[in-house]
Regions:
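Generic detection of well-ordered alpha-helical segments
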Residues: 34, 38, 42, 50, ...
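Low-complexity intrinsically disordered segments
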Residues: 2-4, 70, 97
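Basic amphipathic alpha-helical segments that dock to polyanions
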Residues: 70, 74-77
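Basic, amphipathic "hinge/linker" alpha-helix immediately C-terminal to the N-terminal HTH DNA-binding motif
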Residues: 89-113
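N-terminal helix-turn-helix DNA-binding core of bacterial DNA-binding proteins
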Residues: 19-69, 90, 96
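Amphipathic alpha-helical dimerization/coiled-coil segments
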Residues: 2-14, 23-24, 108-136
Length: 136
């Protein structure tokens, strides 16, 4: 494994941290990949990459996501340092979510995936039909 420098926790700053091997079963990178490759995480991060948003605005924009799933995903992304949550003591309380600098580093890759999927969806559908037809 390659070593890098851990800089996300101030008390651990400068501590050598193994880069990881996503192909290894016990590598924590897999859990992170599961989270950032999740459809809800991708959509949330891309929206927050455009602008800060409140919970209900995210829920309205991401059709099909349940309140529970949105809440769980935001908590996970916040824990990973990809999203930040700001609470303002108003009546009612105002909670705003923003992407962090760490999360911003994902935007280009995530947008490329979305662009690829939207561009190649007809090809994928054609391949699926051909596969299904071949199976009978």
């Amino acid at each position: 494994m390659q070593e890098g420098t851990l800089t996300s926790d101030s008390h651990l700053e400068g501590t050598p941290f193994p880069r990881g091997d996503a192909y290894a079963a016990d590598c924590p990178t897999r859990k992170l990949l599961d989270r950032i490759a999740d459809k809800w995480s991708v959509l949330i991060l891309l929206l927050l990459g455009q602008e800060a948003m409140r919970f209900n605005a995210l829920k309205r924009r991401i059709e099909g996501v349940s309140q529970k799933m949105l809440s769980q995903t935001l908590r996970s992304l916040e824990r990973d340092g990809l999203v930040s949550r700001t609470v303002v003591a108003t009546v009612p309380v105002t909670v705003t979510y923003t992407i962090t600098p760490l999360g911003s580093g994902l935007i280009g890759s995530l947008q490329s995936m979305i662009d690829w999927a939207e561009t190649h969806m007809p090809d994928v559908v054609a391949a699926q039909r051909a596969h299904d037809d071949a199976l009978g």
